[in-house]
Amino acid sequence: MITMKDIIREGNPTLRAVAEEVPVPITEEDRQLGEDMLTFLKNSQDPVKAEELQLRGGVGLAAPQLDISKRIIAVHVPSNDPENETPSLSTVMYNPKILSHSVQDVCLGEGEGCLSVDRDVPGYVVRHNKITVSYFDMAGEKHKVRLKNYEAIVVQHEIDHINGIMFYDHINKENPFALKEGVLVIE
């Protein structure tokens, strides 16, 4: 079971490396890793399990954050509707690639955080509002999905991890809250 002690922190060189492609068909080891990553995210969002296991809440996790330089990401985004228990996006992506993106940019009003970053980093992280992503699932099936808004932001954050990019690399160094005209701010 993955816990916070398994997650490496900023400064570790694995977080700045471009991760290796995962062989398809997916090996049992890589499938299990993906499953464990998704379980961590689900546990981190369950108040009882999160407290019991001392987990910080997360919606995404990339293999490099576990000091494993492979192109594997897991995302578990809860529904916006409090009545709906079904997550809006819950999957493991092997070798995800952004095929296309919108011209429209977006950012979270509260900024972004990261399980590998133990400090608050204020500022807007500007990303594409809509993306089309291809990836392989645990069974080795290829998928192509269109994502927008928060789901697109989460997946871009995790894909950055497999490319050696941290969220704060996107923040304007001179003026962290400067935005170009037309950027949507999601609260």
Curated annotation (Swiss-Prot):
It catalyses: N-terminal N-formyl-L-methionyl-[peptide] + H2O = N-terminal L-methionyl-[peptide] + formate. Binds 1 Fe(2+) ion. InterPro entries: Peptide_deformylase (IPR023635), Peptide_deformylase_sf (IPR036821). CDD domains: Pep_deformylase. Gene3D superfamilies: Peptide deformylase (3.90.45.10). One of its GO terms (biological process) is translation. Keywords: Hydrolase, Iron, Metal-binding, Protein biosynthesis. Its EC number is 3.5.1.88. Fe cation binds at residues 114, 157, 161. GO terms for molecular function: metal ion binding; peptide deformylase activity. The active site is at 158. SUPFAM superfamilies: Peptide deformylase (SSF56420). It comes from the Bacteria. Its cofactor is Fe(2+). Belongs to the polypeptide deformylase family. Removes the formyl group from the N-terminal Met of newly synthesized proteins. Requires at least a dipeptide for an efficient rate of reaction. N-terminal L-methionine is a prerequisite for activity but the enzyme has broad specificity at other positions. This is Peptide deformylase. The lineage of its organism: Bacteria, Bacillati, Bacillota, Bacilli, Lactobacillales.
